[in-house]
């Protein structure tokens, strides 16, 4: 994990979900953004012979972590990467694509390359908008653009719903979203918040697995609904 508040919050939440004392010394390896590689961290992690490895890195560190795992021959039963690592562009930086086939992650967005959503009205609107305003980027293959599109869409809907365009009014509206559909969220997913009691707008997602040959992820199974449950494990909430 990255050595910052986000990384620490993830570890705290994971340990809370698994149970106190579930993560022993050496189970958690941190890195600094300026670290040239993650070989040392992965070597330390390999010494614990883990069955499950969670890579909660960002940007180029995602590929560095997976390259180090492959190079050192670490073969956990489950290898999970955070959503921010699941961009095909970042996964494409891994040298041995076959070795990362089967890597797991999660999403709440429709993959832009998935044919089952090709005729979805929201997906079509995304494709049309990106073709018009950002045709030079790889929006048909990289879900990170869909994420940006979706965040913009929910912002617009929040601003439209706010009684006044003031900070307090917009924040109050954002903290009381009533199952708002926006962007390219998966069917069945919506933005819902309930003030301080439940400030998490998205609490449904699905698992997905990486296909090294196709260089993209494939969705697995149905949505997993955590509505109202995230607060039981989350330890750091932005104000």
Which residue ranges define each predicted feature?
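Structural recognition of the beta-strand scaffold that forms the well-ordered cores
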Residues: 1, 26-28, 52-57, 77-83, ...
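Sec-exported extracytoplasmic/periplasmic mature domains
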Residues: 15-23, 43-50, 67-74, 95, ...
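Catalytic-loop motifs flanking and including active-site residues across diverse enzymes
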Residues: 10, 58-61, 147-151, 203
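Extracellular/periplasmic periplasmic-binding protein-like sensory domains
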Residues: 69-149, 236-238
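Short, cationic low-complexity segments
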Residues: 222-239
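Extracellular/periplasmic Venus flytrap/periplasmic-binding protein
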Residues: 1-72
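Short hydrophobic alpha-helix segments
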Residues: 28-29, 221-223
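Segments of small-molecule ligand-sensing domains
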Residues: 132-145, 156-219
